[in-house]
Amino acid sequence: MIMRMMNIADFDETSIEIIGDNSQHSKQSSNENNREVVLKFAAKHQDIRAVGIMLKESVGLGLATPPGLSGFVGGRPKPSPIVRLFSFLIDKDQVNVTIDNGSSKNEIKIPPSDEFDLNSIEQTTAPDFEDANEKFVDVPLIKVAYGRSGDKGNKANIGIISRDPKFYPAICNFLDEKVVKDCFADFLEGSVERYFLPGSNSINFILNDVLGGGGPASLRNDPQGKAYAQILLDQMIPIPEKLLS
């Protein structure tokens, strides 16, 4: 109502997360036994006044909240600008390379090289997996693998490493792009890529357009996807029972 009176358009983007109630776990039901959760909300707008109005209204949390609700941040937050990362390629002959050793600067000439052919890379395939007459047991992925994740702009990178080489073929067989896509369905706007690294018994997943802009451009509480590996490790995966004994 206030924004309408001031002829200010609606927010460009909003984010509401209930931390502590599986807000990061796609398609998973809430935990009704939770006794404490944190409500986080954020918004984007081209007019700083709109964000200021929202933050001013949030002051009411410290003055007249419903029973059982409290605001724990110190003072009223201030609107902050959105900073985005834009990466691109440029011909090396357009960039001067200089070495500065403190006392002098020396320009280095880098001769042009042949253009790299992406098609020359041979992608490794999944290892053979024989599942005939096998009895399977569903276990959390964390029981048979380690995980680590991070970001590059608006992409998330998840590495999964088998705890034992014997689990690797089964993990590769069942942990595919669809499983990962379903796991992050609430966030994922792009595709999922899978790469096999048999030398380390691991898989690398790249999730495109999954971080809401990534870094300071994202409104989420995990804009760098640092918890994504742990979320994926919660997924159930079928493993031959004989390998678990």
Predicted regions and their residues:
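C-terminal non-catalytic interaction/assembly regions of soluble proteins
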Residues: 1-133, 138, 152, 161, ...
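Extended active-site and interfacial segments that coordinate phosphate-rich ligands
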Residues: 57, 175-184, 220-229
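Hydrophobic/aromatic-rich, well-ordered segments within soluble, folded domains that form packed cores
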Residues: 145-183
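C-terminal beta-rich recognition modules with glycine/proline-rich loops and embedded aromatic residues
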Residues: 119-120, 158, 169, 217
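Helix-rich interaction surfaces within compact, conserved domain-sized segments
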Residues: 190-245
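Bergerat-fold GHKL/Histidine-kinase-like ATPase
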Residues: 141-142
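Short conserved micro-motifs at the rims of enzyme active sites and ligand-binding pockets
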Residues: 28-29, 52-54, 171-173, 215-219
